[in-house]
Amino acid sequence: MTDWTDPDALDLSDGETFDSLLDRADTREKGHFFEFFAEGDELAHDPGLRLSHHGSEQWMGQTLNHDPAYWRADTAQERGFEERPVHPDYLLACVMGITVEDLSEKGGYFLGRDDVEFHQPATAGTPLSVTSTVVDTRTSSSRPKYGIVTWETEGRDRETGETLVSYRRTNMIPRREPAATDGGAVGEQDEGGPAMPDTLLSPDGERFGDFQAALDTAREENAAVAYRHERGRTMDDQLVAGLPLSTLNTARQHHNRDEMADSPSGDIVAYGDVTRSIALAHARSDEATYREQRFADERFHDFVTLGDTVYGFTRVLDCDPDAGPERAGAVTFEHVAFNQEQTPVYSGRRTAHIQRHQ
């Protein structure tokens, strides 16, 4: 009888022998299929990532987020922070990255995120504790090999229990067994919204008063406050693979080119939060941001792959002079990221406090 624990029992340098072994070996799977999730399930995510200035600065530098409040202690104190915080985009990406292994590592489509709220600033050295609750599961009539799952996720300070950020996200998740389907559409067909006005206005500056004045003028002239941002950022290996891995995001679509070769994208794709952060960086470069507040109706419309360039477009929806601290007012924006083919790849609504004129 052969002792298969003997290191010399198999010649693994023989390609034919190794191929035969691979064909016969079981694969230890990672992640969960759609059938694993049931409404009401609560999942505690194990990875204990600790926020760091290095991670935050790496994220900001790569995505063009240059707000000095997240780089310098003096500016942070001027903005009312007790100490220099990590960037909220980095915080959100870390919290979501931790959840991927349990929720969406099997792949599928990131359909969107809603009700994103930052409850308080997060600082370097904070250990994260992340939990998710399944709030809805349903079949997909258009894609029987997938189901649709929605989770509510909270990221907390592991030591104090205080909630830092929360959100709701929805993904298509592969099914272990395809569902029976009539092949019908998922919902009603989009009949299109109202046409945009002929006139598009841009604010004259980056302060709250500039946005409010532009919006007031637009309402009087039946126009819209909407504009493009000049900067673009081309997706490279660091953005597509490096940043997701640094947040413990194990989704294969961001770093396994072999796995993705036969996928609809044909290559590894960018983490949605990287694309989002670049688009928001373009917008923030044209405003005097004081503090981020919340995000809603975030959608990811198309793949972003290596070599694609991400640009930004912004529409101003509302200005509230009474919301926020004395030195800032609240502005609600709609942001759209688009690629070099002018194809939208991300959209979302954002409310931020914007500094007033001093």
Curated annotation (Swiss-Prot):
Pfam families cross-referenced by the UniProt entry: MC_hydratase
Notes on activation and inhibition: Shows highest activity at 0.5 M KCl. Does not require divalent ions for activity.
Annotated keywords: Lyase
Gene Ontology molecular function: any one: lyase activity
Catalytic activity: (2R,3S)-beta-methylmalyl-CoA = 2-methylfumaryl-CoA + H2O
Enzyme Commission number(s) from the entry: 4.2.1.148
UniProt enzyme class: lyase
Cross-referenced InterPro entries: HotDog_dom_sf, MC_hydratase, MC_hydratase_acr, MCH/BMMD
Protein family per UniProt: Belongs to the enoyl-CoA hydratase/isomerase family.
Function: Involved in the methylaspartate cycle. Catalyzes the reversible hydration of mesaconyl-CoA (2-methylfumaryl-CoA) to yield beta-methylmalyl-CoA ((2R,3S)-beta-methylmalyl-CoA). Also shows activity with mesaconyl-C4-CoA (3-methylfumaryl-CoA), (S)-citramalyl-CoA and (S)-malyl-CoA.
Subunit structure: Homodimer.
Name of the protein: Mesaconyl-CoA hydratase
Gene that this sequence comes from: mch
